[in-house]
Design a protein with these regions (language model features):
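Internal/C-terminal transmembrane anchor helices
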Residues: 274-305
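Membrane-interface helix/loop caps of multi-pass membrane proteins
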Residues: 1-265
Length: 306
């Protein structure tokens, strides 16, 4: 698990080890790393694939190509499930679960011409019209409702879920993003509210922390895994710890690394450790938070349920 988590290959490591995402008796501590693995593998491949897209002369051709690729990925997931294949293989596979990312590619290529014109103050009249904004906002609201509806439906083990519900959720998410970035969109302004922005800025840390904390807290209090049920109090405690640790990692790890890079952070940390005691405490807090992401993983595995 640790090797897969820190090399962004968790999905394939788990599959090679026979770990089942849907097994209720073996909740892996770093199970949530599978989606980050798919994402990072896409980031590695995208610089190679992007020039091929850019060879297409028109935006519509790029959008169509991305949509065809997304459809192929979804159909491949459906084929794996329909043939009686392993659900975890269908769910974890980068090839079978790339359709959400590819829909994002299509949306980016589709919006690029409009956003370029917006940047130079040359937005076309139709895009600024009240009708366009109302239509896009309605699509965004429909997307939000769709996501909530899909989340409330119990997952099955057929193609209705793999890829049906998953693909539908990705389409709904694309609709929300479209409404969120559309110039003058009311939904975009609503989604930019301070509490939602706070959550969005820390969403990476929230995702990283939530599952290991939940597994450990449930195991410590009930002796079972989260799939067997999470008591309300334990869930609330896991949420509180998740938000606190996400804020700490955002403030003392993510933001400095984005701003100064790894080497810059190391230099600043050494300088801060030589400074007065007040600054030293802040630096140590950052060091402790970073160490928790690495050294704490090994100790956490020992406490995880079998």
């Amino acid at each position: 698990q640790i090797v897969g988590a820190f090399t962004f290959s968790y999905n394939w490591v788990a599959l090679s080890g026979g770990d089942g995402y849907f097994a209720a008796t073996t909740p892996e501590l770093f199970r949530n790393m599978w989606s980050l693995a798919v994402e990072e593998q896409f980031y590695l491949l995208w610089p190679i694939v992007l020039p091929l897209f850019l060879m297409l002369p028109r935006s519509w051709a790029r959008v169509t190509t991305a949509l065809v690729a997304a459809t192929a990925s979804a159909m491949w997931m459906g084929a794996v499930v329909a043939s009686g294949g392993d659900l975890t293989r269908a769910y974890f596979g980068t090839d079978t679960h790339a359709f959400g990312l590819l829909l994002g590619v299509a949306l980016a290529f589709g919006m690029a011409p409009l956003l370029r014109r917006l940047a130079v103050g040359d937005l076309p009249a139709w895009a600024r019209s009240g009708g366009a904004r109302a239509t896009v906002s309605a699509l965004g609201v429909a997307g939000l409702i769709g996501i909530l509806a899909i989340a409330s439906i119990p997952a099955g083990d057929t193609t209705a879920t793999f890829p049906g519900a998953l693909l539908a959720a990705s389409v709904c998410a694309a609709m929300v993003i479209l409404a969120g970035v559309w110039p003058g969109s009311r939904l975009g302004r609503a989604l930019d509210a301070i509490p939602l922005r706070w959550l969005g800025d820390r969403s990476y840390g929230i995702y990283l922390w939530h599952w290991p904390l939940l597994v450990l807290l449930v195991a410590a209090t009930t002796g079972t895994g989260p799939e067997a049920g999470v008591p309300i109090g334990v869930g609330a405690l896991a949420l509180a710890f998740t938000l606190a640790l996400a804020e700490a990692s955002y403030r003392w790890v993510e933001t400095p690394v984005r701003r100064f890079g790894f080497r810059g952070c190391a230099r600043r940390l050494r300088a801060a450790l030589r400074a007065r005691a007040a600054r030293r405490a802040t630096a140590l807090a950052g060091l402790a938070t970073g160490a928790a992401l690495v050294a704490g993983a090994g100790a956490a595995v020992a406490a995880a349920p079998a």
